[in-house]
Amino acid sequence: MSTITLLCIALAGVIMLLLLVIKAKVQPFVALLLVSLLVALAAGIPAGEVGKVMIAGMGGVLGSVTIIIGLGAMLGRMIEHSGGAESLANYFSRKLGDKRTIAALTLAAFFLGIPVFFDVGFIILAPIIYGFAKVAKISPLKFGLPVAGIMLTVHVAVPPHPGPVAAAGLLHADIGWLTIIGIAISIPVGVVGYFAAKIINKRQYAMSVEVLEQMQLAPASEEGATKLSDKINPPGVALVTSLIVIPIAIIMAGTVSATLMPPSHPLLGTLQLIGSPMVALMIALVLAFWLLALRRGWSLQHTSDIMGSALPTAAVVILVTGAGGVFGKVLVESGVGKALANMLQMIDLPLLPAAFIISLALRASQGSATVAILTTGGLLSEAVMGLNPIQCVLVTLAACFGGLGASHINDSGFWIVTKYLGLSVADGLKTWTVLTTILGFTGFLITWCVWAVI
């Protein structure tokens, strides 16, 4: 099948999905599965393989995020119901003021994003975003948008995240220099993202009922309702902070051990297990069960109800995220990304813009930032021969920032951010998609300026 035909099929699929969700008000989970099925058949994937491809897409995403979203949601619900999120928000609001609090939380997200994967870190910070927004009496989008933006920037540009690490190997870039330059460029990108988010947030966006319940601006279900006694004596700032920092520190320890310890070290496997996001969040949840619930006089039944009340909202996020993975997998298997990349490679572009444009096109066409970065690295692996070490790093970063832009409905991260921030699909495209594209272009332009200097 020709490249043009594949691109038309992919474009028609995206348009159909937008019409189903925005105009026809079809549930995103159902719409994503339906469009994925139709695109798979139209793109020529054998009928007997379509089901396997869709299941692989669902499993590939849910295998990594289901447990994390579930545990993170329960931990966040316990912190929120105890009054801990508001306690933390009140403390920092008194110390910094509302405007500085947004900047401070964004800065914290930058450091959190270096060792922790984007989806894990954002899920951990979600209850804090709700708490700060509630205290400031503003939309959680004002906190969540710059926080998510800087975390995704670090995720695509800075080792030890998989995209930049794998691309460095393909493009012969030194990991040390990639880390240093990646962090250095991510800082001004984050600053631009912070102010871009402020401009985007000048408009008011409607929040979903689930997020309104989290903010206690809509009646919650009986199971998830907060008893007044739970918040009369909220936990202190130190306790709440520790419950957030502990899983992050454990994950960091696992990441550092994998980087510094030899593969044969007897403790490496144990440290990697403990440092996995799943185990780290389980440890934090057990601590919250003891410190926020049992020690504060909550009954076992009440504690169980609170933890259980987090799961319906988490289930929606999980299902829609998984369906987004299905759509992305179908687009990958259809060959649309590869065909597009090969077509762009035949156009005589300078090396740095080629790395960015190919990666951005792959990101927009099939959804996964990591796949976009890796594919670009593979396509350009021979083109970087003869470059000096810093130039190899800059080509790698150009590909990474291409993978940052254009996060939309075929990206599972789009659904995580929009669902947690209570955005509709249309508003998600106006906010999150616009912000990631601004961040991607900003990162590339700074990288190009550095290239010109050296």
UniProtKB/Swiss-Prot annotation:
Residues passing through the membrane, by range: 2-22, 28-48, 53-73, 109-129, 138-158, 175-195, 236-256, 274-294, 306-326, 342-362, 384-404, 434-454
Keywords, in A-Z order: Cell inner membrane, Cell membrane, Membrane, Transmembrane, Transmembrane helix, Transport
Coiled coil segments of this chain: none
Topological domain ranges for the Cytoplasmic compartment: 23-27, 74-108, 159-174, 257-273, 327-341, 405-433
Protein source organism: Escherichia coli (strain K12)
GO MF entries: gluconate transmembrane transporter activity
Subcellular location, principal: membrane
Keyword ATP-binding (UniProt): no
GO CC, any one term: plasma membrane
This protein's encoding gene: ygbN
Domain of life of the organism encoding this protein: Bacteria
Protein topology in the membrane: Multi-pass membrane protein
PANTHER family the UniProt entry points to: GNT FAMILY GLUCONATE TRANSPORTER (PTHR30354), INNER MEMBRANE PERMEASE YGBN (PTHR30354:SF25)
Subcellular location: Cell inner membrane
InterPro entries associated with the record: Glcn_transporter
Organismal lineage: Bacteria, Pseudomonadati, Pseudomonadota, Gammaproteobacteria, Enterobacterales
Name of the protein: Inner membrane permease YgbN
Pfam families cross-referenced by the UniProt entry: GntP_permease
Residue intervals annotated with topology Periplasmic: 1, 49-52, 130-137, 196-235, 295-305, 363-383
Family: Belongs to the GntP permease family.
